[in-house]
């Protein structure tokens, strides 16, 4: 038992080292520095042990409908966790179902949850004047052929399928099946966009992101957008919005710092269909 505890401690040390390796002098906020300073009070040299993140490939499926897969430089996370909505600011709405991370480019698509912000939910449907942004049930199946997350809503069923990645491409699909008359339904992906960096589109749009709102239509986008070394291939009808400030439970309201803003790619769903998207690296 003692050796197992020691091994767990060594892995935690390596994981802390892994996380701090992503910090640079350009992305350290005062809040982050303060938290690191707190950790430094307890720092001491010690051994480390390999962790799954050090392996070229691995996957793990939890006992609940959530899992993670690493394929070379790519890490994808699927979450079908369902929780009863509450009014407490400390319990976020479990509305984000996909995250995509690249070891050199960082987080690209975030499945971060929020509060009272359906525009950041993976799916929304408007029924009887109300917007529903969380599934009623879910199921996750992970295999080497593909990872599939099924999500049930009131008027449709969606399967989010993540196919095996190559070194420079991670493809994923959304398969939509109406269960009756399809409500006003939208698909949304949260994109980790960085203020001060350039974003460009296949249709010729090119700007440096700042606090000015962007609401680009499908005519403005074309079939891809490019940002910070990655390109997102998007289906017809997609729209882009920036900036959107996620909910901060400590403020009990949206963030106010542009550094923490995200963008969204949204598509209106029209019936039984399959949407194919992919993230590619330069």
Predicted regions and their residues:
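Beta-strand-rich recognition/accessory modules
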Residues: 222-282
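Extended polysaccharide-engagement surfaces of secreted carbohydrate-active enzymes
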Residues: 1-239
């Amino acid at each position: 038992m003692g050796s197992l505890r020691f091994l767990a401690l060594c892995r935690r040390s390596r994981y802390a080292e892994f996380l701090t390796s992503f910090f640079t002098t350009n992305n350290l906020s005062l809040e982050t520095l303060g938290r690191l300073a707190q950790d430094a009070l307890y720092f001491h040299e010690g051994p480390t042990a390999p962790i799954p993140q050090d392996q070229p490939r691995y996957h793990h499926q939890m006992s609940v409908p959530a899992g993670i897969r690493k394929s070379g430089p790519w890490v994808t996370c699927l979450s079908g966790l369902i929780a009863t909505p509450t009014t407490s600011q400390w319990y976020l709405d479990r509305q984000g179902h996909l995250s995509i991370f690249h070891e050199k480019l960082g987080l690209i698509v975030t499945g971060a949850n929020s509060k009272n912000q359906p525009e950041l939910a993976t799916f929304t449907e408007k029924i009887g004047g109300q917007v529903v942004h969380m599934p009623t049930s879910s199921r996750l199946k992970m295999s080497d052929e593909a990872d599939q997350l099924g999500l049930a809503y009131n008027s449709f069923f969606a399967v989010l399928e993540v196919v095996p990645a190559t070194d420079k491409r991670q493809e994923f699909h959304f398969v939509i099946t109406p269960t009756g008359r399809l409500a006003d339904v939208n698909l949304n992906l949260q994109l980790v966009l960085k203020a001060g960096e350039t974003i460009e589109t296949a249709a010729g749009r090119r700007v440096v992101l700042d606090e000015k709102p962007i609401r680009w239509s499908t005519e403005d986008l074309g079939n891809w957008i490019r940002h910070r070394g990655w390109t997102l291939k998007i289906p017809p009808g997609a729209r882009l919005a920036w900036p959107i400030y996620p909910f901060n439970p400590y403020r009990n309201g949206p963030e106010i710092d542009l550094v923490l803003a995200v963008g969204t790619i949204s598509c209106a769903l029209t019936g039984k269909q399959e949407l194919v998207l992919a993230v590619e690296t330069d």
